[in-house]
Regions:
Chain A
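Short acidic/polar hinge/loop motifs at secondary-structure boundaries
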Residues: 142-171
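Periplasmic-side early beta-strands and strand-to-turn transitions of outer-membrane beta-barrels
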Residues: 175, 196-198, 218-303, 519
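Structural signature of Gram-negative outer-membrane beta-barrels, strongest in the C-terminal barrel
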Residues: 274, 363-370, 376, 395-516, ...
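Membrane-embedded beta-barrel scaffold of Gram-negative outer-membrane proteins
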Residues: 224, 321-337, 382-383, 446, ...
């Protein structure tokens, strides 16, 4: 590309003349500006049309700092990586199910009966509400932690499993990097780059109570690559009747209402502006009818979700491996619902909006060091009159605003080749609780090749949800306890010792943790308000986690997770934290590729009995109740073949192979029996 | 045994030629009229010409350097005299022009890929007289490229190559180098863009690393994100052929900068006799190794630093010559 017209060349036959090229200085300024702008956007060729240009051209920076994942033995936190193969092999139907493979993660199928019939995914148990509000969840850096109750409504996320590249689960608090609500852990979902999902793919699934059709198109036009994924899913959820009820009363014979239809539309487009700059755009929609509720209690006559988001992410690769990134997104989660409750018919509409802007800069301030720093602002607006109508109010109208400002930094310093220090923290200011600082210090010592010890200490917070804040205002009103101190963030001080080792083809990840939780929030319980503290809860959690990944042969892979521990708590005001961490839980996945056609996997899960808080209405239990231990076995068998020259795959996936009937989280939440589905997939 | 003998002969031969060249250059009049013909005035081309001028000016020769640019070049600009003259054609367009309409003097082509030089020389019948139409290639010899793979990732010896269907000739000579270095070469061919990802995925199942090739049908800016991301996900590192590749996310690359080639050219010129009897087409003598430590760390690969890899490659190349 020539933007500068070449004038005549003045080259005197001087001895040893340095080439002097008289280029078009006479070009008009405007043309110069246009040329400059154009060349900025298309710094295409440094060289001309010659075939040597391939040696001279700039190449787009693809693996920039934010695209490169940190190896787990260098991370300041414990991380479990779930890759595409693991997701496939697990046979998971719902995104939330995948997390059963993460040591220490407690997953309860479709446990929430009130706001949305969604699974509870809680790291280290300690579940006091079904919306597992103590863990942050991000999709491509976009927080999907909902403002209303906290936590995540998994079926409301505009995402299709097959578009996920990998999931990084941070086991332990990480407010230093991800801010408040990264309290017990963080789930980081990373979708595939459109450049990796080119072509047309069609996938269909049929099974007991389940149907799904997915179509994906990935295209490319010059420096633009894009992907469009559309899907429709019908999910009947649990059986209507409980097969092995705990009580003869009707109430305990019926599962919750949890049928759902999910329409998904996702667009992701990545545009390479020039060799250093990329722009990523995402749009997602998730909508459709969703049932909620339980027999003889609150339930939806009609309920429909309408969610969408838009995101723009600009990245610039800097010299020396640095990066500047600016990300902006907007999310709307909308529910249209008519509910039936003891007051008759109620309007259960809700609108949750979020606007977020984040700037992040990565660079190397001195040799062997890397600094990531930046800041973000967020505005949440929550409208949920029915759900915020706490106490005697049936409705609380209004758009509740919430502002969040963050400033963060983390310095990674490789003091010696075998010694990596991470020092960082976050300063955060929000509408509800003011300013908090959450620091972290970690050191990773590569004792010898393939053996690393990690010691880290960090602090983290969880800020009150809009619902909790509304309760706070309610209790602090003149008619109740005007002297009640304002609610604060929940806090945790976390210390851990980790070991990451490699023994041939076996990867070992072991850690011991000691988490000191304080200021735990309880708002629904009148005793907490009467006692003068809505932040009275404390708990000490100690335990261990082990994760093994073994490539037994070229064709066989084994992944095992084990966790255990205990919680000590005074259970202030009767809020149960003790025993809320299962004494142990295991997961084991064995996958084997027989040949180019056949492959299969077997997955087993076992969770010890676990204590839960008061959401269960079992009359035989008072505050707190145990859910018995359970075992589950899943399996998958796949056959790959060519259909008209195109790659095709037929799979049969069986969840709960043993047809075990057991409860998760609540005694009116019986896991479906054996659920077999057939999946057909064709790359067109 | 026979090979070793031939290599020994070559070794001896090259020394004889070299010493002969040295003595000739001392005894006879050297080339002192140098014309540099640039394909264009882009930074790489001017870097070459200015570096060459600088190096020549530092030498003892009293050569004159004239720089021309192809777009403004007329054949009248060149001297009709072949003696004491050499023309350095920089880049493919300049080479093509000189192949099409040969000037009186010898032409040394630089910044041209090997297979392009061979193609053009053959096309215009200039391959018969390599001593008057020669080249210093832009690409690296196979033993150097494979040597880098070997030195960077010892023990990972399955190397994948992705090619377009018309570029098989790029691979000439690779098997021999691969055999010497005990590297297993896997090749996949992508016939069109829609075949790129399937071919790459097939390749990734049986490769420990990939080597990018100067094949513009595959390795162009629109495909590079797919290739780099897909291979990175499979934890298969990519070796590039320019510094830009390393910046983009390749694990390492060995390459010669225009300045390094200029240094080589200057040494060739200083060794020429007045009849400008050019040495045979050859690979660049000087090169650099770049590595991407962020990528190696992310893939948990332990890798030597650039300086020691360069040293290793130097000794490897010297041993092979």
């Amino acid at each position: 590309m020539h933007f500068l017209a070449l004038g005549h060349i003045l080259l005197a036959e001087k001895k040893h003349s340095i080439p002097y090229i008289h280029s078009g200085i006479h070009l008009s300024r405007r043309a110069g500006c246009v040329a400059l702008l154009f060349s900025l956007l298309h710094q295409a060729a440094l060289a001309g049309d010659g075939e040597e240009s391939i040696f001279l051209d700039d190449v787009p920076v693809v693996l920039s700092a934010s695209r490169l994942s940190q190896p787990i033995n260098e991370a300041p936190v414990a991380v479990t990586i779930i890759d595409r193969q693991m997701i496939k092999d697990s046979g998971a139907w719902d995104l939330s199910e995948i997390f059963r493979l993460v040591p220490g993660m407690y997953v309860a199928y479709h446990a929430d009966p009130y706001f949305s019939a969604d699974s509870t995914v809680a790291y280290h148990g300690m579940v006091t509400t079904t919306t597992s509000d103590r863990m942050q969840v991000l999709i491509d850096g976009r927080s999907v932690y909902a403002s209303l109750f906290g936590g995540v409504n998994w079926s409301d996320l505009p995402i299709v499993l097959d578009d996920i590249e990998r999931i990084e689960v941070i086991r332990g608090p990480d407010s230093a990097s991800y801010g408040a609500n990264s309290y017990s852990g963080v789930i980081n979902i990373i979708t595939r780059h459109p450049a990796e999902t080119q072509g047309k793919t069609m996938s269909m699934a049929f099974g007991k109570g389940r149907k799904e059709g997915i179509f994906r198109y990935g295209g490319k036009s010059g420096a633009l690559s894009y992907r469009l994924t559309a899907s429709i899913r019908e999910d009947q959820g649990e059986d209507d009747r409980i097969k092995r009820p705990t009580s003869v009363f009707t109430f305990w014979n019926l599962n919750k209402y949890d049928n759902k239809t999910i329409h998904n539309l996702n667009l992701r487009a990545d545009y390479q502006l020039n060799s250093a700059d990329t722009m990523e755009f995402q749009f997602g929609y998730n909508g459709g009818p969703r049932e909620v509720g339980e027999y003889n209690n609150v339930s939806a006559i009609s309920r429909r979700a309408e969610n969408h988001f838009e995101m723009l992410h600009w990245r610039r690769a800097l010299e020396g491996g640095g990066e500047l990134s600016v990300q902006a997104f907007h999310t709307v989660e909308r529910v249209y619902a008519r509910l039936k409750d003891s007051d008759g018919i109620s309007d259960g509409d809700a609108i949750l909006r979020r606007y977020d802007l984040e700037v992040q800069h990565t660079f190397s301030p001195f040799a062997n060091a890397r600094l990531v720093w930046g800041g973000s602002i967020r505005y949440d607006q929550t409208y949920a009159p029915y759900y915020l109508g706490v106490g005697d109010n049936q409705y609380l109208y209004g758009d509740f605003p919430y502002h969040l400002r963050r400033f963060f930094g983390n310095l990674e310093w490789r003091a010696r080749p075998d010694l990596v220090f991470n020092v960082g923290g976050m300063i955060e200011n929000n509408t509800y609780t003011g300013t908090d600082t959450t620091p972290r210090f970690a050191v990773n010592w590569h004792v010898q090749h393939g053996h690393t010890l990690r010691l880290s200490h960090s602090r983290a917070t969880r800020s009150p949800s809009v619902y909790e804040k509304t309760y706070d205002s309610y209790w602090r009103s003149a008619e109740f306890y005007p002297g009640l101190p304002e609610m604060q963030t929940e806090r945790v001080k976390s210390t851990e010792l980790g070991y990451i080792g490699k023994y041939g083809k076996l990867d070992v990840d072991f850690r011991l943790f000691y988490d000191d939780y304080s200021q735990l929030i309880d708002v629904r319980n009148k005793r907490s308000a009467a006692g003068g503290n809505l932040n009275a809860g404390t708990a000490i959690m100690r335990g261990y986690e082990l994760q093994l990944k073994a490539q037994l042969t070229d064709k066989t892979r084994l992944i095992y997770g084990l966790s255990g521990g205990g919680v000590k708590s005074d259970n202030v005001n009767g809020v149960v934290y003790s025993d809320s961490l299962p004494k142990y839980s295991h997961s084991l996945m064995l996958s084997h590729r027989v040949n180019d056609q056949w492959s299969g996997s077997l997955v087993a899960y076992q969770v010890a009995r676990t204590k839960f808080n008061s959401t269960d209405y079992n009359p035989r239990e008072n505050r707190g109740y145990f859910i018995d231990s359970n075992r589950r076995l899943d399996g998958k068998l796949s056959y790959q073949f060519k259909l008209g020259g195109k790659a095709a795959e037929c799979s049969v996936i069986a969840q709960n192979l043993a047809d075990a009937r057991y409860f998760e989280y609540r005694h009116d939440n019986e896991l479906p029996g054996r659920a077999v589905r057939l999946n057909f997939r064709l790359d067109m | 045994m026979r090979w070793q003998f031939v290599r020994y002969l070559r070794y001896v031969g090259s020394w004889v030629a070299f010493s002969l060249g040295l003595s000739l250059s001392q005894s006879c009049l050297a080339v002192d009229n140098i014309t540099i013909l640039l394909s264009e005035d882009g930074p790489a081309y001017t870097e070459f010409s200015s570096q060459l001028s600088t190096v020549l000016s530092q030498g003892n020769s009293k050569s004159t350097v004239k720089v021309l640019i192809l777009s403004a070049y007329k054949s009248e600009d060149l001297s009709r005299n072949a003696n004491n003259q050499v023309l350095i054609a920089v880049g493919t367009p300049a080479m093509t022009a000189m192949a099409q309409k040969p000037p009186a003097m010898a032409v040394l082509n630089v910044l041209v890929p090997r297979h392009t030089f061979q193609k053009i020389a053959k096309q215009f019948g200039r391959n018969q007289d390599p001593h008057h139409f020669s080249a210093i290639y832009f690409d690296q010899p196979w033993n150097r490229q494979l040597g880098l793979v070997r030195a960077t990732l010892p023990g990972r010896n399955r190397l994948g190559l992705l090619l377009s269907k018309d570029s098989a000739e790029i691979l000439t000579g690779i098997q021999l180098a691969a055999k010497e270095l005990d590297i297993q070469i896997n090749v996949e061919t992508a016939t069109d863009d829609s075949e790129l990802l399937p071919a790459l995925r097939r390749l990734l199942t049986n490769s420990d690393s990939l080597l990018a090739l100067p094949d513009a049908a595959i390795y162009n800016r629109n495909n590079i994100p797919s290739i780099l991301l897909t291979s990175y996900r499979q934890k298969v590192p990519l070796f590039g052929f320019s510094a830009a590749y390393v910046k983009a996310g390749a694990l390492a690359a060995v390459y010669s900068s225009p300045g390094q080639i200029a240094q080589h050219v200057a040494e060739v010129i200083q060794g020429l006799s007045s009849n400008a009897y050019l040495p045979l087409p050859q690979y660049p003598r000087y090169f650099s190794v770049n590595t991407n430590t962020q990528v190696s760390r992310s893939l948990s690969l332990e890798m030597e630093d650039e300086a020691s890899l360069t040293r290793k490659l130097k000794s490897l190349t010297e041993r092979a010559q």
